[in-house]
UniProtKB/Swiss-Prot annotation:
GO biological process: tRNA wobble position uridine thiolation
Lineage, uppermost ranks: Bacteria, Pseudomonadati, Pseudomonadota, Gammaproteobacteria, Enterobacterales
HAMAP family documented for this protein: Thiourid_synth_A (MF_00413)
A Pfam family that the UniProt record links to this protein: TusA
Its job: Sulfur carrier protein involved in sulfur trafficking in the cell. Part of a sulfur-relay system required for 2-thiolation during synthesis of 2-thiouridine of the modified wobble base 5-methylaminomethyl-2-thiouridine (mnm(5)s(2)U) in tRNA. Interacts with IscS and stimulates its cysteine desulfurase activity. Accepts an activated sulfur from IscS, which is then transferred to TusD, and thus determines the direction of sulfur flow from IscS to 2-thiouridine formation. Also appears to be involved in sulfur transfer for the biosynthesis of molybdopterin.
Domain of life: Bacteria
Organism (species): Enterobacter sp. (strain 638)
Keyword Cytoplasm attached: yes
Protein name stated in the entry: Sulfur carrier protein TusA
Keywords: Cytoplasm, tRNA processing
Stated family: Belongs to the sulfur carrier protein TusA family.
Length: 81
């Protein structure tokens, strides 16, 4: 089985940051990316379990995968158009 998290185009380590900083950093990073590129987000703020999926829905990015059972949390998104 392929680890979806193993080959992202970009990686953002947001560990140690608290709401709203992780989502602000994701938004800033996504702005520099090309459509279709992927971003691995590593975070430990419990609020990201709600905020990252909500950000993806609101901004029309695809949340490809998420692991939130244990710290650090990992999210993989693909930039939309």
């Amino acid at each position: 089985m392929t680890d979806l998290f193993s080959t992202p185009d970009h990686t953002l380590d947001a560990q140690g940051l608290r709401c709203p900083e992780p989502v602000m950093m994701v938004r800033k990073t996504v702005r520099t990316m090309q459509t279709g590129e992927t971003l691995l987000i590593i975070a430990d703020d419990p609020a990201t379990t709600r905020d990252i999926p909500g950000f993806c829905t609101f901004m029309e990015h695809e949340l490809i995968a998420q692991e939130t059972e244990a710290l650090p949390y990992r999210y993989l998104l693909r930039k939309g158009a």
